[in-house]
């Protein structure tokens, strides 16, 4: 539940603010230098100053810095009064290694904007569960090193973090290519828009992320509540339809799943083989989902572009306008039971 002591208006970005980049999953060594330089330039154009954690380039035989070093960079970013936004560098597989070593009291005392996606799902949801602080599921720092097709993502970033409100309509185009390997020969696909599987407006607290990573938190003290929630879920091209089916089933078996007020499903990557017909069949077989409004093909996850969704903040969905609204200043506590 959102910490009522956090004044989100005071956390909004202003010109000359510092963005701190940390690598709680994989090392920044995996990111090409041209991508890093382009991302830095993008933030300079936004009037923001970029700094990096001391250990973002460290890596062991599994491609990450040690747990102690990754936690140290996280703590340093939250403790530094100059830092206003913390961005994760890239995803990976092991941010959950940090959870039992984090000083959550330090984080709660020094609230910041924190944003990332994919494996960072574990870190984001744990921080929200332990502190009540809203955090954000959205682009990594490396995402901003994309040469083409970044405009939608930047607009969402500005509206959310500078102005505190973003009305998210479906993007005009999307892409699922390996842009970080080939910036020139991009393939952009016309977006048919949100897929409305169950009609209905939604109002609730955002929670979720990468579904397979989110479910790693099940039964732990780092698992966030689903009470009054808009649950948003996505996964990578490695996620098959059978994998998605069982992960979704696991969520429906939670004691608090009956309190979920809506579900948003991020766009599946092409290599997953999951299409809308398959998804509708999976959804139709789950009675726990029958009465829950549900949108799919939403612009978050492992395709581009990226919108930004709060974990522990308000999400509103207007089915007639086909619009998802994120408003940082709204309190989830004001929602009726």
Curated annotation (Swiss-Prot):
Entries under InterPro entries matching the protein: Carboxypeptidase_A_C_sf, Class_I_gatase-like, LdcA_N, Peptidase_S66_N, Peptidase_S66C, S66_fam
GO BP annotations, alphabetical order: proteolysis
Residues of the active site: 118, 234, 302
CDD domains for this protein: Peptidase_S66_mccF_like
Pfam families in the cross-refs: Peptidase_S66, Peptidase_S66C
Keywords for this protein: Carboxypeptidase, Hydrolase, Protease, Serine protease
Name of the molecule in the record: Putative carboxypeptidase TP_0688
């Amino acid at each position: 539940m959102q910490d009522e002591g956090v004044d989100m208006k005071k956390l909004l970005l202003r010109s000359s603010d510092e963005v701190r980049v940390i690598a709680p999953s994989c090392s920044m060594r995996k990111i090409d230098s041209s991508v890093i330089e382009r991302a830095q330039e993008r933030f300079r154009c936004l009037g923001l100053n970029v700094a990096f954690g001391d250990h973002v380039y460290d890596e062991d035989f599994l491609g990450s810095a040690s747990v102690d070093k990754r936690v140290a960079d996280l703590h340093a970013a939250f403790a530094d009064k100059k830092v206003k936004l913390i961005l994760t560098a890239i995803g990976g597989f092991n941010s959950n290694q940090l959870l039992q070593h984090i000083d959550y009291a330090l984080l709660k005392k020094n609230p910041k904007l924190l944003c990332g996606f994919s494996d960072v799902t574990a870190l984001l949801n744990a921080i929200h569960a332990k502190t009540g602080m809203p955090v954000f599921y959205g682009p990594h720092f490396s995402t901003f090193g994309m040469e083409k097709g970044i405009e939608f993502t930047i607009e969402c970033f500005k509206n959310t973090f500078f102005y505190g409100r973003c009305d998210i309509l479906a993007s005009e185009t999307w892409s699922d290519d390996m842009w970080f390997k080939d910036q020139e020969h991009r393939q952009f696909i016309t977006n048919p828009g949100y897929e409305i599987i169950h009609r209905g407006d939604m109002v609730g607290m955002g929670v979720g992320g990468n579904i397979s990573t989110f479910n790693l938190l099940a039964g732990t003290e780092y698992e966030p509540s689903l009470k009054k929630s808009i649950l948003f879920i996505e996964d990578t091209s490695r996620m098959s339809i059978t994998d998605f089916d069982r992960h979704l089933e696991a969520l429906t078996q939670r004691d608090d799943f009956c309190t979920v007020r809506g579900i948003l499903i991020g766009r599946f990557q092409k290599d997953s083989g999951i299409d809308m017909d398959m998804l509708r069949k999976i959804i139709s077989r789950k009675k726990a989902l029958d009465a829950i409004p549900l949108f799919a093909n939403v612009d978050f996850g492992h395709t581009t572009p990226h919108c930004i969704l709060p974990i522990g903040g308000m999400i509103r969905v207007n089915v007639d306008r086909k619009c998802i609204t994120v408003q940082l200043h709204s309190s989830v506590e004001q929602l009726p039971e």
